[in-house]
Amino acid sequence: METSSPALSVALGVMAVVLGLTGFGVYQAFGPPSKELDDPFDDHED
């Protein structure tokens, strides 16, 4: 059986981290925690 190259392992690790951070960002922006976010334009009515 052929062993995987270190570059492939690093690439898959980086891809997993990027996808995890993207998923966390989408969850923060549109999930339940988004109710706590403030809109700065609503805070400064003229």
Swiss-Prot record:
The keyword S-adenosyl-L-methionine does not apply. Keywords: Membrane, Thylakoid, Transmembrane, Transmembrane helix. It is found in: Cellular thylakoid membrane. Pfam families: PsbN. One of its GO terms (cellular component) is plasma membrane-derived thylakoid membrane. Belongs to the PsbN family. One of its GO terms (biological process) is photosynthesis. This is Protein PsbN. It comes from the Bacteria. It is a single-pass membrane protein. The gene is psbN. The chain crosses the membrane at residues 7-27. May play a role in photosystem I and II biogenesis.
